[in-house]
Structure formats: structure tokens, C-alpha cells
């Protein structure tokens, strides 16, 4: 019987959610999260709203890698469930939609998990403590602060576990079986690999929960659920199989993690835990889980065993920098598209379920004392705050007026230096002009063939080298700058602030003096190639290849060109936390 839950529990749930998004709510125009994935998320959410409201095709966009465009379906599998749910928030709150939507996301996570917890435990205190812990578990907090709400949406998978539990306890109705399939399919539609992660969790749970003598009946219901799931994911699966057959799927039809600019040593659980944000080994959670495994008797041992198996999958296909094959992957590695799982640490999303169960078992052993539960939650949030993940990082998504003014006239943008994923993706949601490169330009696996060829154009190479390596000798481009207009490029935008990131390694070796003069050299070389700039502020310089545009609001002056931006990078808060914990170099 599901226990009656007091209404005051929502105050306990809502408080950490509100604390997490409060800095974003107090910063109009900001999005939750920071870093490269946050930029892409902000763009995708805007794109889905645009497609829904204007009846466009979300599977392809002409705004990146113009004129080729970008095949979004082949690159992402159209994981847009969370983006669709964000549309009302974008309409209601405009550029400040992200904070309210993230609050809603956390409430959805809480509601679905509480349904499961209320079925597994009869004591109201267990349900409330487990749900409060789930709200702030390190995986969800880290994914949100890094700008990945898609991976933090866990609305459906607790419901799938709930339906499986009911089936294994004797509920053989078609409705429950269909609900199991639908919840699993929705998990996959939200983030495709989460469908695999959930299946890896459901298999041992089904074997454990099903009663001897009733397993055949449970298997029949589970089979019905699997069929429902297959029907619901079939549109994507068939489309992706066709794209795979035609060699259109990056990472499956060629190009591994390195081709996607992913360090092979940083995408599995172990090195994520030791070099990135601590998730499973965050001290409060690790102590609670290990305690639960010891004092929880058989139940604790089973939950801990399930967590270990799932974590073994999350180590990735190869260990030790690629030298050792993970034996677990000899079992799961041949599943369709799993070769594209460049971030297997994300299986932590389902490992957090047994981790939460173990924490509750430990709490029960301590007599369900309120002080112990409060201490655990406080230490969990303190650990996340120390690592720089809580409250959630946030980023100003506003497009600079200099760019908005230029974009009132037609033309493609070439952003320099190239090969860097930056917040210009967020700006594009407002200036809405095509770009020469765009999302994925730092990852060769995602380049259209036409873009890969155009990068070798002598003018493109000259502009890139002038902005990124002004101290090195360059080969002069052939012909005049009309070669750029033939590519469709009108606007060349120099991000002076991004140049600092390119020179970070040399700065760390030789100090700030090594940067002296480089900014001026880059501008001088670009002026030789493009002529005088059309507009400038301290961090941006804009050239009009056609030579027809000037912006009186941002006049080009010698003082502006001679004053470089502050030579400090705007690094995400969680990266600063990793530096503080000596997990990431400065």
C-alpha cells in the first residue's frame, strides 16, 4: 500500500531546486550551465521551438556549415523531448527561459522518483529522504551545471522501474506492460543511450524481483512491454539504420572519440571520477552507499552488485589509455550504435538508483534519525558546491549589439579563430544568419565533406592562421578577397577573447609577456587581408568583405584596436572547481 505523504515534503524538495537555479533566475538572459555543451543546448532548444512554431524540419539546419547545412538527425538522433517541453518556457520567459525550465525539470525528476520510492517503501520517512537525496544527486547536478539537461532528464526511467516492479509482484495487466514499454521508449527518445542504460538496469532487477514459479508470467508481460517500446522507437531506429547504411552517422561510420575532440582517457567512469567532478565517489554518497552495502544484508549486497556491474560498463570499452580491453564490453560492445557511446560515464544516471537505495538502507540502520538525513543532504550539497557544480553554473546568452546590428543586413558569418566551439552558438539564436562553420567545428567527425574541403581554401587558411598564430610565417592567399564572397561569406568576426584560450599553454609556460603584441599582430594581418574593420569593441572586431558597412554605434578607433581584452579566460565555474581540487590543470 502506498503511504500517505505529507504536503510539507514539497518544501524540502523545492528548496534545493530553488537554490540551484537562483543565480540564473537573478541574471536575466542567462541560461543554466556553462561550457561547450551549454552553448549547443541553448541553440538546440531555440531551434526546436523555431521548427515547431514555424513548421520546420528539426532534422536539418541551413545555419551551420553553409551552404551544406548540418544533418542534425544523423549527428544526434533527434533527442528533442526535453527541448519540446521547454517551448512554453521559451514563449513565456523569452531569453530568461532556462532557469524556470530547469526548476520544472527537477520537479519532474522528483515526482517520478517519489512514485517509485512510495511503492518500494512503506515508511513515509524513507520515501521522503530517498526523494530528497535523488533531487540533488551528484550526476544530475553535474549534468545541469555543465549545460546538459538532456542527460539530466530522469522523468521516465523511475516509472519504468516502477512498472517492472509491479509486473514482478503479480500485476500482469496489459496496461502495466504497455506502461513499462512506453516509459522505456520515452527514456530512449530523451537520450538514446539512456535507453540502453535503463535496459542494463532492468535486466538484473527483473531477475531479482520476479518470484520463483511466476517468472514465466512476468516474462510474458515484459515481452509485451519490449514490443511496445520497439514500436515507439522504430521511427528513429529505422531512420538511423538507413543513415548508417549510407555512411552518414559520425562515430559509427568512421571517426572515434578523438575525431570528435574527445580525450580517450576522459570519457569513462574511472577517470571521470578521478579527474572530473566526483559523482559516485563524492564523499557523502560513497560513505552512505558503502555503509548501506554492509548493513543492508542481502538487499544491500544485491543493490551494490547491480551498481558494480553497471559501473563496469561505464568504464568504457578500453582501459589504461586504450591499452586494455574491458571484458564487460565483450558482452555489450556489439549492440547497435554503442560504438558511438563516447561518454560511458553517463551510465551513472542509472547507477544513482542503487546508490540512493543503499543510502536509505544506511539511514535505516541509524534509526531513521532526522539529524543523519539532514547531515547527509548538507554534506552532499557542500561537496557539490566545493567542486563548483552547485548552485548551477550559468551563462549570459545575450548576443552583443555589434553583431546584432550587422546581422540586420544579409550575409554569412565567418568567426575567428576557427575550430573552437563557443557561445557564438547562443548568439546565433538571436542574429539568425548562417555561419561558415558552427556546431561541431572543433570535431572533424561532424564536418560535412563540403566544409572539410572549403577549409583548405587559401583565404580561409590565411584568415585562420592570422588570428590563431600571428607570429608564424603564413602563405599568402591566391587572388583577392572576392574568393570569400564566392563562398558566401560577408562578415568576418574576430573573437579577441577566444585567442587567449589558444595561447593558454604558451602563457602558462612563459607568463603573460608571451602574449604581448600578438593581439596587435593578428589585427594588423587581418587588416592587410580584409581592409579596415567595419566595427569594433574591446573583444570583437568586425570586417565587411564587401566594404559597404560601418556601424556608427561601434566606431573603429586606434584606442580600441590597441586595447586587448582582459587576458583572463571566462572559464566555467565547474572547471574552476576542478582546478581548485587539483583535478584539472590551469
Residue ranges and their predicted role:
Residues 379-586:
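Extracytoplasmic
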Residues 16-109, 132, 137-142, 148-154, ...:
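Membrane-interface coil-to-helix junctions
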Residues 143-151, 255-260, 309-354, 451-458:
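Membrane-helix boundary/interfacial segments in multi-pass membrane proteins
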Residues 13-19, 101-120, 125-210, 225-229, ...:
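Membrane-embedded helix bundles of polyisoprenyl
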Residues 2-3, 207, 211, 228-231, ...:
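Hydrophobic, aromatic-rich transmembrane alpha-helices
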